[in-house]
């Protein structure tokens, strides 16, 4: 199975399966002399960790990260710092229940990657989905914590802005509220609504989709490159690679199709520190290059495919059958995608910073 690596200069390779011994990643291209400890990475992993509320999978994983290589104690400062060598990270799996999947080992779960993995490789890991499981995203979050260290002047934040058909009231947007509710929602009132709404979905054994918005503040003008190395191209690809994501937009995205040229234009005026934009429909990127405004992206997460309702499917022999999925699953996988989105955008920005320096210096 190829294509387990993303990035150009700041490269991340992930490995491991949902029900394997461990998962992990190797980060290659991280600059040297950056202070880095396991605690720096653990903070981000704890936000994504499963089993923290009734609204996420009840699989209990501590997600304790171990740094295996790429760091050492600096002889002068006494701080643990990166050396420029590949940084290997390991997270042990401790709460697998493979027996929950024994009844479906010969059946394809609708909406999952079971059929396509089987069609391509002739084999699939039916125990929790293997590499296609959201469990893999813990390694991305770990890599993202390192990426944040590479771009310390940039703040990458994400929030859940829609669940099912219900959107937040953007007039109530409060970043401080994101950490105060189990949905990472910036609208306090809507977060309360989501509790009852998702409880109903969960008790019915079903699931629901969501929309996540990610914003990067502090990205300077000039990152990215024309045509085939666009900043928004890489952000879109990174977000699209997250499990269960089915759509990505930058800035106003698909809504711009309903606007006129006058409405969509991000007009400019002279400011004390250079040109100032009067709006940000473009999401902080024009021609594939950052404008200095906040970089904004959104993505849609489909409903979790593993639900308790019986569904029609076929088995490996091509016979019609029904399937009932057991196991522990997120009623809204979009909740835990918030921290994953931040990590992926942070990795893209770290990659583009290094590429930018390589092209123009500084």
Curated annotation (Swiss-Prot):
Co-factor(s): FMNH2
Positions of FMN binding: 131-133, 243-244, 287, 302-306, 328
Alphabetical UniProt keywords: Amino-acid biosynthesis, Aromatic amino acid biosynthesis, FAD, Flavoprotein, FMN, Lyase, NADP
Catalytic activity field: 5-O-(1-carboxyvinyl)-3-phosphoshikimate = chorismate + phosphate
Pathway stated in the Swiss-Prot or TrEMBL entry: Metabolic intermediate biosynthesis; chorismate biosynthesis; chorismate from D-erythrose 4-phosphate and phosphoenolpyruvate: step 7/7
One function term, GO molecular function aspect: FMN binding
Pfam families, A to Z: Chorismate_synt
Binding site for NADP(+): 48, 54
Family membership: Belongs to the chorismate synthase family.
Subunit structure: Homotetramer.
Functional description taken from the UniProt entry: This reaction introduces a second double bond into the aromatic ring system.
Name of protein: Chorismate synthase
Source organism of this protein record: Rhodopseudomonas palustris (strain BisB18)
Species lineage: Bacteria, Pseudomonadati, Pseudomonadota, Alphaproteobacteria, Hyphomicrobiales
Encoding gene, per UniProt annotation: aroC
